[in-house]
Amino acid sequence: MKIAKVEPLPIGRYLYVRITTESGLTGIGESGAWGHLEASATAIAKFGAYLVGRDARPIEHHWNVMHRSHHFTGAAITGAISAIDIALWDLKGKQLGVPVHELLGGAMRQKARLYAHVKGRTIDEQAAHVSALRKAGFTAVGHLNPLLDENIEEPYFRAHARKMRDAIRNVARLREAAGEDMDLCIEIHRRLTVPEAVTLARGIEPYHPMFFEDPLPPANPDAMAWVADHIPIPIATGERYTGLHQFQTLLARRGAQFLRPCICLCGGITGGRKIAALGEAYDAQIVPHNPLSPVSLAACLQLGAAIPNLAIQEYPSASPGADGSAVLPAHELVTGLDRPQDGFIRIPDGPGLGIELVPGIEHREPVRPRPIQMRPHVDGGVVDQ
């Protein structure tokens, strides 16, 4: 199964790769380096020059060559490797006529539990979205930032007491909207210091969040582990990690109970299954990160079908309508992916990833690059949001 062509495909706000064999079979993947997709596309083209003319089947070999050649990596590089790896698994499944999860040992489950995204600049908006999603059958919601996603151009400042009390009250309001049969996945987006993270986590304990995601920037596993050791609720982190050893360092320090590998950034399905096995050894649960398109979701579901420690799958739904419907962004770009039902989604069982890009979609959907932007602080610096 020789590779004839490797194409980076920027479509809308996403970056795909399409690998075509000499027989005309195609596989697709997606890069998760979403802030720097232009650089990731260049890396895809460079790796493509290596892959063309080679057999697509020895995926682990190609994965090692791409990771170990030229010594240097980083998100743009691992995003490219991840996209290519996913596409190679897609190709292999299609060649053999089986879904990717069959190649990973077979399905442990036929559907995956989802948590839907909730967005809103006010707590009233967030609470309304939680209620709508509960009525639509979802059993968990996430992307819940009790610090709120305010106008990114407005300079930020909050006194400590106000910041903590408002956030705790917001979580209480979200729990009221969710009831007791819906889990809350609290997402902080790295906006706290170590003492703030401890204060907030202790304050929201009575509302039983499923996890407390990314309270701190992830670069310092010792700081994350210190927080984990001083709070009564579990931490989830890892979406910015680009490889296995970052997760190993975090777990060795007991810095998280839920791991958030981005399959489109951490090395694709090959990297993801290594991280899942590592997590299993530490009794850590896997919550695949997915703020991307249905291609990313399909890759997450294929891996999630075949691992024992899948906790829940992130589902980046758009804000729900009045009927509670939760539409997946960019759903129109692919075919073959079911809609959620009762808070779960069926894992595709067609060959490969079980989905396809709509033919010619790259010519109909203009590229939408992401500008460099951060929220200013009143002191002249910047803050994460």
Question: What kind of feature is each model-predicted range?
Answer:
Residues 20-96, 384-385:
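Metal- or metallocofactor-binding catalytic centers and their adjacent structured scaffolds
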Residues 85-121, 125, 136:
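Glycine-rich, aromatic-flanked loop segments that form ligand/cofactor-binding clefts
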